[in-house]
Amino acid sequence: MSGKGKVHGGKGKSSDSAKASTSHSARAGLQFPVGRIKRYLKRSAQNKVRVGSKSAIYLTAVLEYLTAEVLELAGNAAKDLKVKRITPRHLQLAIRGDEELDNLIKATIAYGGVLPHINKALLLKVEKKKQQK
């Protein structure tokens, strides 16, 4: 005998003080799934490159921020048109209305329509006619 008294097997804390497991998203304070993003990164990495957990958290935070930004602008566009549901048209108006998002998102949005655009030369003629009257 080693003389150390009763020895229980295993390492760590006793079972009565075991805490519940928390997700990576909860620890990072995010709504988007960090574990899923990490899995996608690992799957798409070439030559079995190692993917750090902080890179998945950072990418998830960026995706969550961009989504929140687009949804906020689209919600404002829907509110301006006095409707309660965001449609692809509202997303189109929100993205094309913001210069930075327009540069970032070059994709075509299905059923988004087109932005109304009137050439400045045509606007000047209308304003001159109004001033003459």
Swiss-Prot record:
Pfam families the record matches: Histone (PF00125), Histone_H2A_C (PF16211)
GO cellular component: euchromatin; nucleosome; nucleus
Subcellular location: Nucleus; Chromosome
Keywords: Acetylation, Chromosome, DNA-binding, Nucleosome core, Nucleus
GO biological process: CENP-A eviction from euchromatin; nuclear-transcribed mRNA catabolic process, non-stop decay; regulation of transcription by RNA polymerase II; silent mating-type cassette heterochromatin formation; transcription elongation by RNA polymerase II
Residue positions, PTM N-acetylserine: 2
List of residues that carry N6-acetyllysine: 4, 11, 13
Subunit note: The nucleosome is a histone octamer containing two molecules each of H2A, H2B, H3 and H4 assembled in one H3-H4 heterotetramer and two H2A-H2B heterodimers. The octamer wraps approximately 147 bp of DNA. H2A or its variant H2A.Z forms a heterodimer with H2B. H2A.Z associates with the VPS72/SWC2 subunit of the SWR1 chromatin remodeling complex. Also interacts with RBP1/DNA-directed RNA polymerase II largest subunit.
Annotated family: Belongs to the histone H2A family.
Name under which the protein is recorded: Histone H2A.Z
